[in-house]
Amino acid sequence: MTEAAASDIPPFRYTAALADEIERRWQDIWEREGTFHAPNPTGPLADPEHPRAGAEKLYVLDMFPYPSGAGLHVGHPLGYIGTDCFARYQRMAGRNVLHAMGFDAFGLPAEQYAVQTGTHPRTTTEANIARYKAQLRRLGLAHDERRSVATIDADFYRWTQWVFLQIYNAWYDREAKRARPIAELIAEFSGGVRRTPDGRPWRELTDVERRSVVDEYRLAYVSQAPVNWCPGLGTVLANEEVTADGRSERGNFPVFKRNLKQWMMRITAYGDRLLDDLDKLDWPEPIKLMQRNWIGRSIGAHIEFPTSAGDSSAVGEPRINVFTTRPDTIFGATYLVLAPEHALVDDLVPTAWPSGTRDAWTGGQASPRAAVAGYRKVAAAKTDMERQAETKEKTGVFIGAYATNPVTGAQIPIFIADYVLAGYGTGAIMAVPGQDERDWAFAEVFDLPIVRTVRPAEGFDGKAYTGEGPAINSAAPERGLNLDGLGVAEAKARTTAWLEASGHGSGAVTYRLRDWLFSRQRYWGEPFPIVYDETGAAIALPEDMLPVELPEVDDFSPRTFDPADAGSNPETPLSRRRDWVEVELDLGDGPKRYTRETNVMPQWAGSCWYELRYLDPTNADRFVDPDTERYWMGPRGEGDCGGTDLYVGGAEHAVLHLLYARFWHKVLYDLGHVSSFEPFRKLFNQGYIQAYAYTDARGAYVPAEEVVERSGAYYLGDVEVSREYGKMGKSLRNVVTPDEMCAAYGADTFRVYEMSMGPLEVSRPWETRAVVGSFRFLQRVWRAIVDERSGASRVVDAPADEATRRLLHRIVDGVRGDMEAMRFNTSVAKLIELTNALTRLPATPREVAEPLVLMVAPFAPHVAEELWRRMGHPTSLAYADFPVADPDLLVAESVTYPVQVNGKVRGRVQVPADASEEVVRAAALDAVATALEGREPRKVIVVPGRMVSVVR
């Protein structure tokens, strides 16, 4: 800018420099005065003098961020600004608003950075948190900073460990349909109310046997389970952390199925409630559908198939339990298939092939054990998606054992095959090739019998028939079951009744949902409050020993292996701190030596309950005070689920964080620790801010800010480049940060731009060049109040003219409706309309200026505070009353009708708002008389308040 041009700028214009000064000053004032502190009903955060003490409460919650080293780009704060606008509006509307921000700071990225650099993950994470706090403060977010938490702080994860212990020391009573303390289960066993699994009295069981019985009921338990082992990362991954092609989401390493001892959470016990209570939530339907599908409730029957037990008489005769949604097809079950990892396989495999075993069944091996071992090795290298692909050729091996079909009495061979997954159902299926396409394909490969049990529809010429029809080939009168001629529903019911009566099975509900893998072989996570005694039994530490703090270690990394080494075993970083692992404790029966659990909790642990800690963050005696929880999150009335009033975050958390948090919250509810049975009453998914990236002829990304558009093409200098649309990222060289925008225009402009880009729930492209439009809007708001030349107020106490007053109240009415519905973009559009009208006036009437500033405040709070102060108000507008429209001024005095002749607008007519249809018709015909050329119109249609259509 030239000196002459600079001198032309009025001295009191709203500029980026002035915005910076105003914003920093008001941020300091808010912090110093505790402007956004929300009072609790009791305790140290109570404040009976607060302007909203005793008011209707509102709890607004953001999904708290993981503080990465890259800091925020302009896409990250979209939801935070949206919730801030909503919270500011609600505060001005008279509510006591709790809005806080914390940090989800444990996790793999910080640990991997520590491994690469040798810097302790706490050092980098705390530095990242400090940077995030500075960036968020610069945006003017109205958080109650007293309530900020970080999951890595011992004062926080002490309570994460406490919640874990509540879950560990609880069991799910299926009759009562709720969790109960484990002590009540033990009392039922010891009092004879509940039978032990083998029928022996409780008093006859040893301590080890009693522990074993109780552990089978616990909601948190250790299990030898098929898990996703990633040698390249040296850790076990949850299903959700594995990509569809069977690789780790982090690092892109191959992942293998292995049986390993891990901590699990019995989330499946809550399958029905997690599913049914979705109907009580105000959530987007796509998110509900994703959870319903993830839980995957299926109604059918468990059927037990007796077997011979390999060569081991000690095992007895184990039964293979299968779950099927079609028990009516049992007459067509001609073989069984087990997942290669199924726990019974090793018990069933004999040393030699039975007489008459077909060569095609053996996998080319000399013995069943060799065949099983070889097949397992091949299956372990495949992803679940590869194993279940419909197009792949079916493979498997006979394990050398047979089962008995309980209804036909036939001996049917048992195979293992990779298309059956250990983690789904029971890990075993009864194969009915006549009614299942995959079973048909397998039967064809291995030349197995095919029996149809449902009559195909007329004209059917396919293979497996999966449709409806009467039962056929389904009679065993000697066993008391005849299904022939019955429809599917009746046949299913009759079969289930027979199974239960004969002791061969029972009706059942199963879920696609699996128990939650809850341990990680990492360093940077919450330690478990668990030790092991000399027998290897897990023992929960008492609450007065919490927190179990994460110790310092020299090497943060788990031992990693060749990414292809599926047979490797986990070795955790904590296991190398022997002075921490091996500990002497007095747990009530004198000092003894114990071994600490060396796995850590997954990154999801802290986020499962953090919304509760915001309520009472300084409480050293409870994770949350009951009265405080009831005030902020309690049910509103009969049947209400309770929870936060608004939760805003990305849809990508639909089946991870959101499901896990619901599970933890329901356990806490069952045990009486919270009054709400859902954590998040209303969920809103914000869209994403995306960006254009540009590549040169080599495919290399070039700086997006240096690219210019000419004649529909894009150039870096004189070189044409290609444009693509998607994410922002450092590697894409298209990152724009909030810091840059605040420096160039101010935080208020950045906030207004993000809220005006489109509906909050819709993704949209970032356009740096368009930000100036929001800046100019705020300049016009400033000019409506402040004289740019003198700095004097342009606000006058003279009344507004009728048109301006009516416009104001129409805008107020529209903005209030938009703010309640979080339609922020249309709110901004209305404010622009009002501001543009004011700039045409010689001075701004106070009765319009003050409502304008109050309505601008949620979006541009700093400049609004400054203008409010300049208009003579000594206190912050944060608790000023949001404008309310006068209903009398919302009634239009006149209406303008466009008049169409044969579909084209030929004129307009203004008539009184209460004009009759005859008056409107006459005025419209008069207005288009020239277009009618003296002819009588064939038809005149008056759409009240909208338009007039004339057909000539």
Swiss-Prot record:
GO molecular function: aminoacyl-tRNA deacylase activity; ATP binding; leucine-tRNA ligase activity
Record keywords: Aminoacyl-tRNA synthetase, ATP-binding, Cytoplasm, Ligase, Nucleotide-binding, Protein biosynthesis
Entries under Pfam families matching the protein: Anticodon_1, tRNA-synt_1_2, tRNA-synt_1g
KW Ligase (keyword) present: yes
Gene3D superfamilies per the UniProt record, alphabetical: HUPs, Isoleucyl-tRNA Synthetase, Domain 1, Valyl/Leucyl/Isoleucyl-tRNA synthetase, editing domain
The EC number(s) this enzyme carries: 6.1.1.4
Subcellular localization(s) per the UniProt record: Cytoplasm
InterPro entries xref list: aa-tRNA-synth_I_CS, G2_nidogen/fibulin_G2F, Leu-tRNA-ligase, Leu_tRNA-synth_edit, M/V/L/I-tRNA-synth_anticd-bd, Methionyl/Leucyl_tRNA_Synth, Rossmann-like_a/b/a_fold, tRNAsynth_Ia_anticodon-bd
Enzyme class (EC, first level): ligase
CDD domains assigned: Anticodon_Ia_Leu_BEm
HAMAP family: Leu_tRNA_synth_B
Name of protein: Leucine--tRNA ligase
Gene (name only): leuS
